[in-house]
Amino acid sequence: MLCLLCGYSGNILDIAARYLGVPYVAGALEGAGEEALVIDEQRLDCTTFVELTVAHWMAEQCDTLSFEGSVQGMRYRDGVVDGYLSRLHYFSDWVKENTERGVWSELTPTEADAHLWEADTLTLSFMSAHPQSYPYLKAHAWAVDSIRDIEANYRNLPIHYIKKSVLNLGPDELPIRNGDILALVTTIEGLDVTHLGFAVWKDDRLHLMHASMNHGKVVIDERTLYDYLSTRKSCPGVRVVRIRNEE
């Protein structure tokens, strides 16, 4: 269990806001070379933005946790850097591993808000089906079978997401809080999510703080999340993850 019960000193958005304006880069961790712990706070993709923010937050809560150690613990299976296959590539794998470590928990429907949610099942296969999209897999064909073995743990996985059609509701009607991690569910075969960021409530409307490809940097999107998703036909809604001490 992680030391996440130390004195609370601020919310996650305070730390996330430090990255506003930092340039966006696609695939910040992807490369064909040997795996190493990479921490680049000058260029962020959507995952490293969330990951580094949470790692800073964890380290600031407890003197026994370092920032670098927190990044490594979140990013790698069992917190050990042991090649490309030890990195938690899929959002669902990343969430499961760090839920078990006590970092966060994924929200699921309650009796009161069940009407806001959709249930589905998920089978991961995208990486093994598209190795040419990943520099390491393209250069090391032998690793594809190992990725497929990891994916096999996520066949017909039950998931719940909040429907995008209700994301225009206010903070008293949605279970989403400031600082929750929001992940955009996708209908792309074999993939779980395509993007993630933090929930930000502004004037009782939900927005996304994220490393944005369109803006080329970390922003609080000026569009509401409802409007942002209205043009994303492959996204039916969002999964919601809450950091443990933010509960």
Model-identified regions with their sequence ranges:
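C-terminal soluble interaction/assembly domains
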Residues: R177-E247
